[in-house]
Amino acid sequence: MELQHHIKCKPGDLGRSVLLPGDLERAKLISTFMDRPRHVASSREFNTYTGEFQDVPVSVISTGVGAPSASIVVEEAIKVGARNMIRVGTCGALQPNVHPGDLIIATAAVRGDGTTPEYIDMSYPAVADFHLVRALVDAADELGASYHLGVIRTHDAFYME
């Protein structure tokens, strides 16, 4: 497998688990929580770090804003060995009980974006992996973090409801 065109990674550069923030600086910040972090690559909005967390190889790659650039990262990361990916970063909420800093753990998504229909028909439900959701809930409980579980909505217009 060759070097990936956009993320500039090759097999062995990434852990099986990858965090996907939109912002390059957030990727750098996340890497500071890793043991032995190393900067793997930078290309356009894609900034990649790999290290270890609790002796497990993990990576973080910034995706830029939106589903189209995130899909580039996901496709190329899979080609070089990533298997578990979690999008982290900005979201909004309409419920008054959701506060800044609360975690949102998506159990499913209403797809209102233009990218996901390129992968699968809109009639197919976008439901999160149960085991991954359970692991996120367990971790949030262990940390004492405030979190909310539920169905999210994704779409292309950042400031539109």
Predicted regions and their residues:
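Metabolite-binding pocket within alpha/beta catalytic cores that recognizes anionic/polar moieties
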Residues: 1-134
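Active-site rim beta-loop-alpha module in soluble metabolic enzymes
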Residues: 126-161
